[in-house]
Amino acid sequence: MKGTLLLLALLVTGELGFQRTEACIPFFGVYLGILSGNRIGLHTELAPFDPTVEEKEAFEKIQDCYEEEGLKAKTEDMKLMTTILFSSECRSYYTKEVLKNILVKFSKKLTHGS
Protein backbone atom coordinates (compact mmCIF):
# COMPACT_ATOMS: atom_id res chain seq x y z
CA MET A 1 0.00 0.00 0.00
CA LYS A 2 2.81 2.42 0.86
CA GLY A 3 4.44 1.69 -2.48
CA THR A 4 1.18 2.47 -4.25
CA LEU A 5 0.92 5.85 -2.56
CA LEU A 6 4.51 6.68 -3.38
CA LEU A 7 3.98 5.68 -7.00
CA LEU A 8 0.82 7.81 -7.18
CA ALA A 9 2.70 10.77 -5.73
CA LEU A 10 5.47 10.40 -8.28
CA LEU A 11 2.98 10.05 -11.12
CA VAL A 12 1.03 13.12 -10.01
CA THR A 13 4.24 15.11 -9.61
CA GLY A 14 5.56 14.13 -13.02
CA GLU A 15 2.27 14.23 -14.90
CA LEU A 16 1.20 17.64 -13.66
CA GLY A 17 4.65 19.14 -14.08
CA PHE A 18 4.85 20.34 -10.48
CA GLN A 19 8.07 20.90 -8.72
CA ARG A 20 8.27 18.54 -5.78
CA THR A 21 7.78 21.32 -3.25
CA GLU A 22 4.62 22.45 -5.06
CA ALA A 23 3.22 18.92 -5.11
CA CYS A 24 4.07 18.17 -1.50
CA ILE A 25 1.15 19.91 0.21
CA PRO A 26 -1.51 18.64 -2.24
CA PHE A 27 -0.07 15.14 -1.94
CA PHE A 28 -0.38 15.17 1.85
CA GLY A 29 -3.89 16.59 1.56
CA VAL A 30 -4.96 13.69 -0.65
CA TYR A 31 -3.04 11.22 1.51
CA LEU A 32 -4.86 12.42 4.62
CA GLY A 33 -8.14 12.43 2.70
CA ILE A 34 -7.53 8.75 1.98
CA LEU A 35 -6.67 7.96 5.60
CA SER A 36 -9.73 9.82 6.88
CA GLY A 37 -12.05 7.13 5.55
CA ASN A 38 -14.44 9.92 4.59
CA ARG A 39 -15.43 9.97 0.90
CA ILE A 40 -16.45 13.63 1.02
CA GLY A 41 -13.10 14.59 2.54
CA LEU A 42 -11.28 12.57 -0.11
CA HIS A 43 -13.27 14.16 -2.93
CA THR A 44 -12.64 17.62 -1.49
CA GLU A 45 -8.88 17.01 -1.56
CA LEU A 46 -9.05 15.58 -5.09
CA ALA A 47 -11.28 18.35 -6.49
CA PRO A 48 -8.47 20.80 -7.44
CA PHE A 49 -7.08 18.12 -9.78
CA ASP A 50 -10.41 17.67 -11.60
CA PRO A 51 -10.18 13.87 -11.48
CA THR A 52 -12.11 11.60 -13.81
CA VAL A 53 -14.66 9.17 -12.43
CA GLU A 54 -12.12 6.37 -12.89
CA GLU A 55 -9.45 8.28 -10.96
CA LYS A 56 -11.87 8.97 -8.11
CA GLU A 57 -12.77 5.28 -8.02
CA ALA A 58 -9.08 4.34 -7.89
CA PHE A 59 -8.50 6.60 -4.88
CA GLU A 60 -11.66 5.26 -3.25
CA LYS A 61 -10.28 1.73 -3.64
CA ILE A 62 -7.07 2.79 -1.89
CA GLN A 63 -9.20 4.35 0.84
CA ASP A 64 -11.16 1.09 1.15
CA CYS A 65 -7.89 -0.84 1.58
CA TYR A 66 -6.93 1.40 4.49
CA GLU A 67 -10.39 1.00 6.01
CA GLU A 68 -10.13 -2.79 5.77
CA GLU A 69 -6.71 -2.76 7.45
CA GLY A 70 -7.97 -0.62 10.32
CA LEU A 71 -6.55 1.99 12.66
CA LYS A 72 -3.30 0.16 13.36
CA ALA A 73 -2.30 0.16 9.69
CA LYS A 74 -3.26 3.82 9.30
CA THR A 75 -1.25 4.77 12.38
CA GLU A 76 1.81 2.82 11.27
CA ASP A 77 1.64 4.36 7.81
CA MET A 78 1.31 7.88 9.24
CA LYS A 79 4.34 7.23 11.46
CA LEU A 80 6.31 6.16 8.40
CA MET A 81 5.24 9.22 6.40
CA THR A 82 6.07 11.50 9.33
CA THR A 83 9.49 9.90 9.70
CA ILE A 84 10.18 10.41 6.00
CA LEU A 85 8.85 13.97 5.97
CA PHE A 86 10.94 15.05 8.95
CA SER A 87 14.09 13.18 7.98
CA SER A 88 17.20 15.29 7.63
CA GLU A 89 17.05 14.87 3.84
CA CYS A 90 13.52 16.23 3.58
CA ARG A 91 14.08 18.98 6.10
CA SER A 92 17.05 20.20 4.08
CA TYR A 93 15.06 20.04 0.84
CA TYR A 94 11.72 21.57 1.84
CA THR A 95 11.37 25.08 3.14
CA LYS A 96 10.16 25.65 6.68
CA GLU A 97 6.98 27.13 5.21
CA VAL A 98 6.18 23.93 3.28
CA LEU A 99 6.80 21.79 6.38
CA LYS A 100 4.64 24.14 8.45
CA ASN A 101 1.78 23.89 5.93
CA ILE A 102 1.98 20.10 5.98
CA LEU A 103 1.90 20.08 9.79
CA VAL A 104 -1.18 22.31 9.70
CA LYS A 105 -2.88 19.86 7.31
CA PHE A 106 -1.97 16.90 9.53
CA SER A 107 -3.27 18.74 12.62
CA LYS A 108 -6.56 19.67 10.97
CA LYS A 109 -7.14 16.12 9.75
CA LEU A 110 -6.34 14.63 13.14
CA THR A 111 -8.53 17.18 14.95
CA HIS A 112 -11.50 17.28 12.59
CA GLY A 113 -11.19 13.92 10.85
CA SER A 114 -12.06 15.31 7.40
UniProtKB/Swiss-Prot annotation:
Full protein name: Secretoglobin family 2B member 2
Subcellular location field: Secreted
Keywords for the protein's UniProt record, in alphabetical order: Secreted, Signal
Superkingdom: Eukaryota
UniProt note on tissues of expression: Expressed in lacrimal gland.
Signal peptide: 1-23
Gene3D superfamilies in UniProt: 1.20.920.50
SUPFAM superfamilies named in the record: Uteroglobin-like
Lineage of producing organism: Eukaryota, Metazoa, Chordata, Craniata, Vertebrata
Family of the protein in this entry: Belongs to the secretoglobin family.
InterPro entries registered for this protein in UniProt: CH2-like (IPR015332), Secretoglobin (IPR016126), Secretoglobin_Domain_sf (IPR053723), Secretoglobin_sf (IPR035960)
Keyword Hydrolase listed: no
GO cellular component: extracellular space
PANTHER family the UniProt entry points to: ABPBG26-RELATED, SECRETOGLOBIN FAMILY 2B MEMBER 2
Gene (UniProt): Scgb2b2
Species whose genome carries this gene: Mus musculus (Mouse)
